[in-house]
Amino acid sequence: MKPSIERLDHDDYIHRYVRIDGQRIHCVAAGCGQPVLLIPGWPQTWFAWRHVMRALAEKGFMPIAVDLPGTGHSDRPLDGYDTGAAAAKLHRAMAALGHEQYQVVGHDVGMWIAYALASDYPDAVLRLALTEAVIPGLARAPDIFAPPEQNIFLWHFMFNQLTDLPEALIAGREKAYLEFMFDRWSHRRDRVAVDVYIAAYAAPGGLRGGFAYYRAIPETIRQNRERAKRKLEMPVLAIGAEHATNDAPLATMRGNAVDLCGVVVPDCGHFIMEEAPEAFIAHLAPFLEGRV
């Protein structure tokens, strides 16, 4: 089925729905210039990129943030949540928007998908920035008996993969569950739009759509073991946060990218684009401009 586009303009952004195989993907753009695809993670939406979008638009880029399939204002398909399938949909969405080549920035689960996108479509992805995650199939599997300060960033990987039980326990209690995450994963929680994300994941199908990326981890690992046989050749920037993954994004990509650099943003938690937007952009913008 040929992709189609619905355009809805309001606020400072252009909101579009791109239909891929009959399913809508919500895309939000600002500015004009070289396109930069911004992929959020769990449990967030495109809104996590709002500060980055404004800054990149002012610097002459066209940032395009998405709601991943199954989340936010995008449709909620029954399957297709492994990173290869998600990357293919986003690549087709960018093509439908008129962009055959673009730069990519991914956070959290969005980092997993950004890596798959760069590996599967190397001629399309000019530069790749990855932040605040490790990638299943590239990183070593974490220890089950981890100390509490590590386990707080790990336990949900197993819980979210369970079939049906998370929804049964959390439905109607989304606020308590998600606030637990935001409280413990952030260092500057007051800067994070927690209520926006709670509303998004409390919407019908929101929980299942987010958990689906975790339930697809076995297939994503299988794919990534194949991807790891060839290193990325485009420039790659890995950004960590001092009070979250620290240098883990860089460590994950060592040996998997030819042209790799990394940085750790101090005094910051997991939600780096909201907690420390100025510092994040100070590293990201020169990289996208080709000055790093």
Residue spans of the language-model regions?
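Residue-level detector of alpha-helical segments with a strong bias toward transmembrane helices
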Residues: 32, 51, 77, 142, ...
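Catalytic histidine-centered segment of alpha/beta-hydrolase-like enzymes
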Residues: 268-281
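A generic "binding-loop/recognition-motif" signal
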Residues: 23, 33, 268
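Surface-exposed alpha-helical interface segments used for non-catalytic interactions
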Residues: 47-50, 54, 88, 115, ...
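Conserved residues at beta->alpha junctions
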Residues: 40-43, 201, 275
